[in-house]
Amino acid sequence: MAPPSRRECPFPSRRFPGLFLAALALLLSSRSDACGPPPTFVAMELTSRPKPYYKVGEQVEYDCKKGYHHFAPFLTHTVCDRNHTWLPISDAPCVKKVCHYIPNPAHGQAILANGTYSFGNQLHFICNDGYYLIGKAILYCELKGSDAVWSGRPPICQKILCKPPPTIKNGKHTFSEVDVFEYLDAVTYSCDPAPGPDPFSLVGESTIYCRDSLGWSGDPPECKVVKCRFPVIENGRQTAGFGIKFYYNAAVMFECYEGFHIIGSDTIVCNSNSTWDPPVPKCVK
């Protein structure tokens, strides 16, 4: 049986070495006598699909990317020169699109995040003291189609006004006849005379002020009788805060007799629950 015959390439390099070398030389010369892919830019892009290499004298065109617009008279094309390099070009012709100018709101400020109105940037809004912001505190310059637009309407600064503060049982506050209070307006509470032998104590902050759009700086105080029991300490004595009756915030100090030491605090205060805080100490050997 005869061995199978081998098929040979009709144009092997061994039979036609001259033809093979000529083709290789033509291929190499076509690539060496050319430019590589054209440069890329942040703001521009080619108007046609890039090729691996370009002939000398071949020209490519650029157009501005989305979000950029052309700024004449700069060139937006380049040419493969005889040195097999692209003629210098930059993307300076294409500049970022910008959002329209927004002025400071009345009684406030509009602050650019990085000093320009170009797309991708932010505009921050703040209000002066005595005013609060209604609307979004930050707007973004965004692309909508081919235009640069703000992400919303600019906010406004509204004057801070407070409703009258709460009334309290067994007490009153100043300016009770006023219907509307402005920023930092303050009222002071006081207690009425008590009907019994012990007076009302004002528990809490006596003065609150109109703070912001949420209202007053704190809760109103209470007017109530606060009276702690007479403090008794065995094997010791009072050194300060003497009295017969002990009302809200009354303070008493103690010391132990010789040979005893104190357990607890040497100073106690009558708190709003009519108890001593901390508890009355003890004197032990």
UniProtKB/Swiss-Prot annotation:
Its main location: membrane. InterPro entries: CD46, Compl-Cell_Adhes-Reg, Sushi/SCR/CCP_sf, Sushi_SCR_CCP_dom. Present in blood and sperm. Isoform 2, but not isoform 1, is present at the erythrocyte membrane (at protein level). It is found in: Cytoplasmic vesicle, Secretory vesicle, Acrosome inner membrane. Residues 1-34 form the signal peptide. N-glycosylated. Probably less N-glycosylated in testis. Disulfide bonds join C99-C141, C127-C157, C162-C210, C191-C223, C228-C270, C256-C283. Pfam families: Sushi. Sushi domains 3 and 4 are the most important for interaction with C3b and C4b. This is Membrane cofactor protein. It comes from Saimiri sciureus (Common squirrel monkey).
